Amino acid sequence: MNSDTTPTHRNKSNSISQLNKVLPVPIELHNGESLEQHQQNHLNHITNVIVGEYHLISGEFGKSYMTWQIKITINDLDYSSIVLYKRYNEIYQLRQDLLKIFPPHDHTITTNIVPSLPPKDNLSLDRLMMSKNWLEERRKGLQWFLSNVLLNPVFQNCSVVKQFVLS
């Protein structure tokens, strides 16, 4: 055989070292986005808020207080949800903190208006517990407030909202 037609044999170690020099192909998702682009374009966000049952908690020195169960769903995934238990005062404080950031007289965008809360009742907890209608109206008011705050993308990105959800 002629030396021009002789097949060339590669050295195995030489091939492996050349493979190691080749950069990996960047990962692309189905729509052509890179992994970095996908993470920037598809940040986690709250997609549903449900205020559920109230729970009566026995506090220090026998004084009781009420908490509300709040289920927050992330990215429309039931398995990606957070369940919080918050007192009315904590929700009230969230509103006060939002009003400091988004004052009522400074509405550049109408979606940034901080919604109102149902009024705080000064009646004793025992008397309130007797009124199931009052509790349901309170739950509906909290549902309305939290939905309007937590589902608003501007409020969602606010540090006080993140702190409320994560604490």
Curated annotation (Swiss-Prot):
The keyword Phosphoprotein is annotated on this UniProt entry: no
GO biological process: protein localization to membrane
UniProt note: domains: The PX domain binds phosphatidylinositol 3-phosphate (PtdIns(3)P) which is necessary for peripheral membrane localization.
Functional note: Recruits the lipid transfer protein VPS13 to endosomal and vacuolar membranes.
Annotated GO CC locations: endosome membrane; vacuolar membrane
Membrane topology of the entry: Peripheral membrane protein
Record-annotated membrane-spanning stretches: none
Keyword Membrane: yes
Gene: YPT35
Pfam families: PX
Protein origin, superkingdom: Eukaryota
Keyword field: Endosome, Membrane, Vacuole
Residue runs in coiled coils: none
Subcellular localization(s) per the UniProt record: Endosome membrane; Vacuole membrane
Name by which UniProt lists this protein: Endosomal/vacuolar adapter protein YPT35
